[in-house]
A protein has these predicted regions:
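Short, solvent-exposed amphipathic alpha-helices that sit
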Residues: 2-6, 34-53, 95-99
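Short beta-strand elements in bilobed, periplasmic/extracellular small-molecule ligand-binding domains
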Residues: 23-26, 44-65, 108
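Short beta-strand elements at the ligand-binding edges of bilobed clamshell
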Residues: 1-9, 26-28, 58, 128-139
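Hinge/cleft segment of the Venus flytrap/periplasmic-binding protein
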Residues: 27-31, 144-225
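Extracytoplasmic "Venus flytrap"
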Residues: 28-38, 90
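Structural recognition of the beta-strand scaffold that forms the well-ordered cores
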Residues: 23-27, 56-57, 83-87, 112-116, ...
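Hydrophobic alpha-helical
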Residues: 43, 60-124, 146
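Hydrophobic alpha-helical segments within soluble ligand-binding/sensing domains
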Residues: 1-22, 67-68, 117-122, 138-154
Length: 225
């Protein structure tokens, strides 16, 4: 999702100055971390199928901004035509942005940067236009998992609905910040009434709606907000 979004924006932004595929680098977390592996594998699968992008190199930065900053500086010198930077976290995207500005680049114009997590600094950078996109929402999975455990302990087995869930992340771009920012700002753990997801507490529910879309109506929010 994030990689495709960066490529689509790159094709739009640099169409007059492009000769060949867009050059991209990726900065991932700790190479042995499950989240890092999953996100990087998704990126590689996408890059292999889209001939409009050339994934130059993937480097680890251990989820640290300063490591991402140093890594970007080295790779930008190695690949001067670099246009797209995919990072596995908003924290590392912040390091890339800092490095780019030190190199007299203009993130959001000369360079399209994306990250993951909906971290506060990432959303701020998206709002400012320095980071084009942030993918996130996976922090909700902990609450949803707790709902399943609660229901099971109350005698409401969830096996018939599946034993494995992988929720889709949401995406916010700088280009649609104005129309979506209010909803994204509301999607915080303290604003969500997880009790409303429980099929034990709400036997009228036929299934579990563990999705970001479920939050749009306000039904699952505290006080319906």
């Amino acid at each position: 999702m994030l990689a495709r979004t960066l490529v689509e924006e790159g094709l739009r932004r640099f169409k007059k100055h492009r000769n060949g595929p867009l050059e991209m680098i990726a900065i991932t977390g700790i190479i042995s971390d499950y989240a890092s592996i999953e996100r990087t594998e998704g990126l590689k699968r996408y890059a292999m199928t889209d001939k409009k992008v050339f994934l130059r190199q993937i480097i680890p930065a251990s989820w640290k901004a300063d490591a991402a900053e140093t890594g970007f500086e080295l790779l930008k010198k190695r690949f001067p035509k670099l246009r797209l930077v995919w990072t596995a976290s908003d924290v590392m995207a912040g390091g890339v942005i800092r490095a780019a500005e030190k190199m007299q680049l203009n993130p959001g114009k000369d360079l399209i940067v994306g990250g993951v997590d909906w971290a506060e600094q990432g959303l701020q950078s998206v709002q400012q236009g320095k980071q084009f996109a942030s993918s996130g929402g996976h922090f909700l999975e902990g609450g949803w998992a707790t709902v399943l455990v609660y229901d099971y302990l109350q005698g409401k087995d969830f096996a018939e609905h599946g034993l494995s869930w992988k929720s889709r992340m949401g995406l916010i771009r700088s280009s649609d910040w104005g129309s979506k920012s209010e909803m994204f700002q509301r999607i915080k753990p303290d604003n969500i009434n997880y009790r409303k997801y429980s099929r034990y507490l709400h036997p009228e529910r036929d299934s579990y709606d563990f999705s970001l879309e479920s939050l749009k109506s306000g039904e699952y929010m505290v006080n319906g907000n």
